[in-house]
A protein has these predicted regions:
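C-terminal active-site/capping subdomain that shapes the small-molecule cofactor and substrate pocket
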Residues: 31-130
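Accessory alpha-helical/coil subdomains and C-terminal extensions
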Residues: 1-33
Length: 130
């Protein structure tokens, strides 16, 4: 919600050249929710400053939402499609890398903050540099 009201947000200048890492957490939200928040970023002009967007693979199963394989695949596709559509409304060329195992997915990779990242879109590779 903070992206829509402006509370606790970084200054625009702090976003120049930043790689944005996002994930939907364990809530298993409907696809429109992350899309809505990303539109808030877009309306602020952030996708003109951000260098790339990396999206964690959405968690698609929880004890109270025991989705089968088909339901999980459908949910993840809806999430991916909505994220791309939302970002592309504001920046048609920014690299969007999706379905990485970080955040609240299973399995998950820990990502250290404060380092650098090298993204090669031609080789389709990502390297964390500490």
């Amino acid at each position: 919600m903070e992206s829509t009201v402006g509370k606790y947000l970084p200054k625009d200048d702090d976003l120049d050249g930043v790689v944005l890492f996002i994930e939907t957490a364990e809530d298993i939200p409907e696809a429109w929710i992350p899309a809505y928040l990303l539109r808030g970023f877009g309306e602020r002009g952030w996708f003109d400053k951000i260098k790339s967007v990396i999206v964690g693979r959405p968690k698609a199963w929880e004890f109270d939402k025991p989705n089968n394989a088909e339901q999980k695949a459908k949910y993840r596709k809806e999430q991916r499609d909505e994220i791309v559509t939302s970002i592309r409304q504001y920046n048609s060329t920014i690299p969007i890398i999706q379905n990485l195992d970080f955040g609240h997915s299973d399995p998950q990779i820990l990502l250290p903050s404060g380092g650098s990242i090298k993204i090669n879109t031609q080789e389709k590779s990502i390297k964390l540099v500490m």
